[in-house]
Amino acid sequence: MAGVRAVQKEKTRRALVDAAFNQLSAEKSFSNLSLREVAREAGIAPTSFYRHFSDMDELGLEMVDEAGLMLRQLMRQARKRIDAGGSVISVSVDTFFEFITNSTNVFRLLLRESSGTSQAFRTAAAREIKHFVDELAEYISYKHQYSQYVAYVQAEGIVTIVFTAGANALDMSKAEREQLKARVILQLRMLAKGADFAANKERGK
């Protein structure tokens, strides 16, 4: 019986997270969400919300954690495509833009909360983005035999470029996004050339 209750509790908690993500939009940030509206969409009474989260901030922090996890899963998915013979930069950009298209509100949350008014949210969002940079740097270092420093600088540059492009892409038409993708691919190729130059300089070449 206790096991059934635990499963039901987890399902309701999941429904609350999904409901909150669903309510985000270009006009509505997390700080504008109402506990009552989130609970209603999740199919529970507002008072039942507190059985799952102590307040809306705790719900928001869980959403930020989940967004970060999705980003890292995204990169692993891109790696599989690359290992199957795809171009590193083109595949990475395509995968990231698919994420923006398919998980728009997840990206919006990370984007907004990394520069929002809540210190706790800013810290959590920055931590998730740094995890993403760290994992990407590790992959670059392994793939190209770069030093940790050069790999980290390149990874940080990649994330800065794609996040900025992602923010711009949210309000673009499909044709405009394709043009943006082409520019981002060129920018990342330029960055890769610079990283290669820096790595060779370190090696004394």
UniProtKB/Swiss-Prot annotation:
GO molecular function, one term: DNA binding
Disulfide bonds: none
UniProtKB keywords: DNA-binding, Transcription, Transcription regulation
HTH tetR-type domain sequence ranges: 11-71
Gene3D superfamilies: Homeodomain-like, Tetracycline Repressor, domain 2
InterPro entries (alphabetical): DesT_TetR_C, DNA-bd_HTH_TetR-type_CS, Homeodomain-like_sf, HTH_TetR, HTH_transcr_repressor_FabR
Any Pfam family matching the protein: TetR_C_46
Database matches in PROSITE patterns: HTH_TETR_1 (PS01081), HTH_TETR_2 (PS50977)
Entry-linked NCBIfam families: PRK11202.1
PANTHER family associated with the record: HTH-TYPE TRANSCRIPTIONAL REPRESSOR FABR
Protein name according to UniProt: Uncharacterized HTH-type transcriptional regulator HI_0570
Species of origin: Haemophilus influenzae (strain ATCC 51907 / DSM 11121 / KW20 / Rd)
Lineage: Bacteria, Pseudomonadati, Pseudomonadota, Gammaproteobacteria, Pasteurellales
